[in-house]
Amino acid sequence: DKLLLTLGSWPIVPNFEGIDLENILLCKNYDHAKIIDEKKGSAKNVIIIGAGYIGVELAEAFEVLNKKVTLIDAEDRIMSKYLDKEFSDIAEKEFTNRGIKLVLGEKVVRFEGNNGKVERVVTDKGEYDGDLVILCIGFRPNTKLIEGKLDTLKNGAIIIDDYMRTSKEDVFAAGDCCMVRYNPA
């Protein structure tokens, strides 16, 4: 018998003060997308936290809907893990020309709100008003099930070889729960 593990991943949700305020959302799956779709109509100031692929796509989508968009990232440029500076500079210029506010090199410290709803994101360098906040700051492998049973990286990703074999014979793993075998970024 063989076992193939496809445990997936889940968005990273830091334990920031105010994280439980209404209208702070995740973006990973269909259910998250439905909630974002429901909330987009009433939102005026949208803050996207995380300027990777998902965050950048969301910023563009909300700009097309004529929302005031702020894109916050701790890195000093958007898509820093995927594009070199020459290309990210072009994308950043296009974003700012379209009215998207880029807040780069700042780390989120907390969320503030009123009547249980988010109103503001506070970073280590500033404060930004927003009535809808979407967290796009990365994912963690869903590997609690195999903790202590298979070899993993520090982040919990299952270590695999070129044939998706794990540290246990006849146990294979694929997808977001595994380490990345090739990542030029």
Model regions: which residues?
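Glycine/Thr-rich phosphate-binding loops of Rossmann-like dinucleotide-binding domains
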Residues: 13-14, 56-57, 80, 143-144, ...
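FAD-site-proximal beta/loop scaffold in flavoenzymes
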Residues: 20-41, 115-120, 127-185
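Rossmann-like dinucleotide-binding cores of NAD(P)H-dependent redox enzymes
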Residues: 34, 45, 53-110
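Hydrophobic/aromatic beta-strand patches that form the interior of the parallel beta-sheet core
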Residues: 4, 25, 47, 70-72, ...
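Nucleotide donor/acceptor-binding cores
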Residues: 2, 22, 43-45, 67
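Short hydrophobic core segments
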Residues: 1-8, 49, 69, 129-138
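Feature captures the FAD/FMN-dependent oxidoreductase FAD-binding
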Residues: 1-7, 110-117
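Glycine-rich Rossmann-fold phosphate-binding loop(s) that bind the pyrophosphate
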Residues: 28-29, 49-52
